[in-house]
UniProtKB/Swiss-Prot annotation:
Quaternary context: Acetyl-CoA carboxylase is a heterohexamer composed of biotin carboxyl carrier protein (AccB), biotin carboxylase (AccC) and two subunits each of ACCase subunit alpha (AccA) and ACCase subunit beta (AccD).
Name of the featured protein: Acetyl-coenzyme A carboxylase carboxyl transferase subunit alpha
GO molecular function, one term: acetyl-CoA carboxylase activity
Pathway(s) the chain acts in: Lipid metabolism; malonyl-CoA biosynthesis; malonyl-CoA from acetyl-CoA: step 1/1
Name of the gene encoding the protein in the UniProt record: accA
Subcellular location: Cytoplasm
Species annotation: Streptococcus pneumoniae (strain CGSP14)
Main location: cytoplasm
Domain CoA carboxyltransferase C-terminal: 1-235
Known catalytic reactions: N(6)-carboxybiotinyl-L-lysyl-[protein] + acetyl-CoA = N(6)-biotinyl-L-lysyl-[protein] + malonyl-CoA
EC number(s) from the headed UniProt entry: 2.1.3.15
Any one Gene Ontology cellular component term annotated for this protein: acetyl-CoA carboxylase complex
Length: 255
């Protein structure tokens, strides 16, 4: 699949969402809401569910599948209260010893005036800091777009995976082309230079695993992700805490 098709597929409105994975993978998934400071952000969803006999905290960025739903979800662009909700749930997981799984699909954090006034940069930076030392295993999965700091704020993890037809980048190809050449129409040319596809990032050791989507139905893909999570969470849970945190630290220091 060429780069243009991969970008289109990553942005496809019918693509599986965080809630699709959360309800399909985890038994008795219960959503939790709000950051306890300002309001609930529909762009970030999270809660607790069971993976076998293991309770897991699930957090992710949610895009809509219709115009009305996208308006509710702010087209998957979180406000600072969304990132603060995510952090609240992750600290709750740490307190009770639950591993964390994050699902990421965003073009980036919302850049509006109100979001900046409420501390968008601080909220993202705090998540990076807190996740780097969170004392439970973390697995992050990019399921569509992984855009800029808005994606990284949920991706400081022990393992970072990508679905095969997803992308992960410092900014959109359109933004890159506009900055570099003052011509947004050269977006796909920019995408080739940026190395944003799953297999390119796996080769550069930015991500740890690519989950194949070829020939799989939605149910089969969810089942595949569930199996991978069960195996990897069991492995990570056996690591001594000091080793887990040191490996996470070194994983990001190497860049």
């Amino acid at each position: 699949m060429n780069i243009a098709k991969i970008v289109r597929e990553a942005r496809e409105q019918s693509r599986l969402t965080t809630l699709d994975f959360a309800t399909g993978i985890f038994d008795e998934f219960i959503q939790l809401h709000g950051d306890r400071s300002f309001r609930d952000d529909g762009a970030v969803v999270g809660g607790i569910g069971w993976l076998g006999d293991q309770a897991v905290t699930v957090v992710g960025i949610q895009k809509g599948k219709s115009l009305q739903d996208n308006l509710k979800r702010n087209f998957g662009q979180p406000h600072p209260e969304g990132y603060r909700k995510a952090l609240r749930l992750m600290k709750h997981a740490e307190k009770f010893g639950r591993p964390v799984v994050t699902f990421i699909n965003t073009a980036g954090a919302y850049p509006g005036v109100g979001a900046e006034e409420r501390g968008q940069g601080e909220a993202i930076a705090r998540n990076l800091m807190e996740m780097s030392d969170l004392k439970v295993p973390i697995i992050a999965i990019i399921i569509g777009e992984g855009g800029s700091g808005g994606a990284l704020a949920l991706a400081v993890a022990d393992r970072v995976w990508m679905l095969e037809n997803s992308i992960y980048a410092i900014l959109s190809p359109e933004g890159f082309a506009s900055i570099l050449w003052k011509d947004g129409s050269r977006a796909m040319e920019a995408a080739e230079l940026m190395k944003i596809t799953s297999h390119e990032l796996l080769e550069m050791d930015v991500v740890d695993k690519v989950i194949s989507e070829v020939g799989l139905s939605s149910k089969e893909l969810i089942k595949s992700v569930k199996k991978e999570l069960q195996t990897e969470l069991a492995r990570l849970s056996q690591k001594p805490l000091e080793e887990l945190l040191e490996e996470r630290y070194q994983r990001f220091r190497k860049y």
